């Protein structure tokens, strides 16, 4: 597809159903599905332990997902914001409190939230509600770039996301492509979800909060497909602990994305 002479990004996940997936990925998803079944039994046997794990993971998730973006405060304040709904005292805490509420929204109501534009915009509005910048729940109005900093501290452009003008159409096409793919019984959801989230990050639809939204949406889609380990072991903390590898994987997976030639 072309527009104004430029190649337009399209979204098609049918390659996940072509039978050519690496054996290690197929085996990994099978192992995860088996562990999910075992965890379901254990949750019924050890209710108190899982309740305590959920409380700890919630604090770790909110702390880590924000820390990845350089948004930090003291551990004491994190605990107060998460466990006592303490009002934010500064901009960083406003960002953290917004993530708390967005994560709570997913934990408590994921069955009623979907990967559709209205719900994505609503989650972003919740995420940004305390910042006072007026951009919550709205797609970007100016083009943005993804920067990286080299060992000498020099900034350079790593990636040019979708333009602001093309973002609404790209998000519509992304959500429709996901809905189409999830209805295909031959497409493994554990492989579909990271592909969709990568595309979301490459669109970079918001002026701020794209990274944190990607992690919230990852949890949402995993929960909706019955994979709720992120409630008990912080998914965001794992990314923060290995963020060098995480960002390198994003870089490799997005090479030639704008040409529809990335390999995921």
Task: Map each language-model feature to its residues.
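FIC/Doc superfamily catalytic core
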Residues: 1-264
């Amino acid at each position: 597809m072309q527009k104004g002479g430029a190649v337009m990004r399209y979204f098609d996940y049918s390659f996940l159903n072509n039978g050519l997936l690496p054996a290690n990925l197929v085996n990994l998803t099978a192992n995860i599905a088996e562990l999910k079944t075992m965890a379901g039994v254990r949750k019924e046997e050890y209710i108190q332990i899982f309740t305590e794990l959920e409380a700890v993971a919630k604090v770790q998730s909110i702390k880590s997902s924000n820390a990845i973006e350089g948004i930090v405060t003291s551990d004491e304040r994190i605990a107060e914001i998460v466990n006592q709904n303490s009002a934010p005292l500064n901009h960083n805490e406003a960002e953290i409190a917004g993530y708390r509420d967005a994560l709570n929204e997913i934990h408590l109501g994921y069955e009623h939230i979907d990967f559709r534009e209205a719900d994505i915009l609503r989650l972003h509005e919740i995420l940004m509600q305390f910042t006072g910048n007026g951009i919550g729940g709205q797609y970007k109005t100016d083009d943005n770039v993804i920067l990286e900093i080299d060992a000498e501290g020099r900034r350079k452009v790593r990636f040019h996301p979708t333009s602001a003008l093309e973002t609404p159409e790209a998000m519509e096409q992304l959500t429709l492509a996901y809905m189409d793919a999830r209805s295909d019984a031959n497409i493994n959801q554990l492989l579909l979800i990271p592909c969709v989230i990568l595309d979301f990050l490459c669109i970079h639809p918001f002026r701020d909060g794209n990274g944190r939204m990607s992690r919230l949406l990852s949890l949402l889609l995993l929960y909706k497909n019955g994979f709720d380990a992120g409630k008990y072991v912080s998914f965001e903390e794992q990314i923060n602990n290995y963020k060098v590898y995480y960002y390198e994987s994003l870089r490799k997976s997005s090479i030639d994305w704008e040409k529809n030639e990335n390999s995921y």
